[in-house]
Amino acid sequence: MKKVLFMASEGVPFIKTGGLADVVGSLPKCIDKEYFDVRVMIPKYSCITEEMKEKMTSKTYFHMDFNWKNEYVGIMEAKEDGVTYYFIDNESMFSGFRPYSDNVLEEVTKFSFFSKAALSALPLIDFRPDVIHCHDWQTGLVPVYLRERFQGSEFFRGIKSVMTIHNLKFQGKWDVKTVKSITGLPDYFFTPDKLEAYKDANLLKGGIVYADAITTVSDTYAEEIKTPFYGEGMDGLLRAREKDLRGIVNGIDYDDFNPETDKYIEHNYNAVNFRKEKIKNKRALQAELGLEQDDKKMLIGIVSRLTDQKGFDLISYMMEEMCQDTVQIVILGTGEEQYENMFRHFDWKYNNKVSANIFYSEALSHKIYAACDAFLMPSLFEPCGLSQLMALRYGTVPIVRETGGLKDTVEPYNEYESEGTGFSFSNYNAHEMMATIRYAERIYYDRKREWNKIIDRGMAADFSWHVSAKKYQEMYDWLIG
């Protein structure tokens, strides 16, 4: 039995702020339990719900030197869906109403503590992993500590580490002097070939330098981050380590996202009866959001953080023109104020055509995936993207820009070969996006049978975690040897 431990800053169902939690909570369930024992370790935030805290039992505790203090470290344990979770507890480190704050120094301190405490806890929980699988900058110090601080102990000798980059933009940077003091690492770690990058200490860089293998969340993104445009200052290092770098596309939980059993949607449906049943969800959503009741009008959905990365500057530029077309547009999400206000304005101006929902609701997101005809994702960059996978699962045709995971998961429609699962454009250009939306409109209105075939192919595609899990298993086997 090979043993793997995921170390991360969040994981469903205990705590979630984004797609990272879905990966950490879903992937371990799908890895073959006959050959692998996969467990998860995350912080015990005080903002975890009481219902979830009640599932935890105390395992043990110890004290650890950190940042010139002797800190308490509690270890809690819980079982969920057949997976063992461990929680690192320290009230002062993990207090607050949210898992993350906007104070970068606070975040760097908190996750430096978590990295050291998580490794220090292993001998006490009677679990010696063959591989520690780290996720994003919050666990970037784990491979560093493992190689340089813990390898002297017999227990840790030979443990391998994997660093998964979910979004290279976030790196955990702070000034060298402070990070040196917090981590207790000596001077020779803070050089350009180790943790120092552009005069700052960089926690993600530490993980990339010291991990035995590096993964990211799609094949295309793995190639993109080796270029200056997408590399966020790390492209040189990633090119140097390209033999150890691989892309593995994320999956989605096919039990949670299943139009046949989804409790949030008005009318359940499947790949066989969607032609009759999906339209009922459209009517229900139009009624709920106060849009004009019209079965035939193309309904375009957007569920996203409203930021530049997600392509909202393109949408902002073209929104007036889109509203002149025979379409309805539903938006769900929060983000930059300029985009929130832009959508509010168009909701006011075209009240029966545009519905701006500037908040987040799990229930409404499911209703949008089920009700819409098309789903728009014109991202500037997208490491993997999960929304397009949910759209495909629900028979909602994605319109995307060809970048990262969007390029890997949405096959562009080809009317001559009658193939493809969505529509895509390659250049980051508002007019090219608009031309692609209009092309999709044309197929939707003039060639309904073709449109339904696109839906058929999208719903038949398999982006469940089981496909990704096999690739992770191959990597663990390769590492363990």
How should these model regions be labeled?
Residues 1-481:
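Catalytic cores of nucleotide-sugar-dependent glycosyltransferases that transfer UDP/GDP/TDP-activated
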